[in-house]
Amino acid sequence: LGAGMSGGLIHVAGDCGDSAGGLIAGKRFGMTGGTIVIDGSAAARTAEKMRRGTIIVRGATGAMAGVRMLGGTIVAEGGVGPDAGRLMRRGTILASRLIAGADIPATFADCGVHDLVILRIMARNWTRELGPLAPRFTPHVVRRYAGDLATIGKGELLLPA
């Protein structure tokens, strides 16, 4: 779903399978723009090698959400599964929690608690652009984990403080 997407909006009224917004065979990148809103949960490898765009998941993501991510944003209102952000270069994963069995990857650095103004700006923009499809979960005070430090480490995993 949305593999290779470069713009527009996809709204899924239920759950989604593997690789939403992810890599398509023969391409260098997954999603390169646009927005995907999934009302249910998303399976493994959501946003694999995503370059830009936004994926909003009302439920939880499966294992390896944002694996090898190059940019863009994932909002996981139900939480993220194991290995979220593994080998992420840039991008943001905003999650409500880590689901059972998931840990912060060892190659992510705890950067402390922050009140990020950009989250307010993003929430306002999503509300204006998406209306009722906008994320319902947008905390302003978050604990920021930078990574993946096994690569260039410019990505981030944000969890409520």
Feature locations, PLM:
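Short acidic, glycine/serine/threonine-rich loops at helix termini
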Residues: 50
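Intrinsically disordered, low-complexity terminal regions
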Residues: 11-13, 17, 26-39, 43-45, ...
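Hydrophobic packing positions in regular secondary-structure scaffolds
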Residues: 20-21
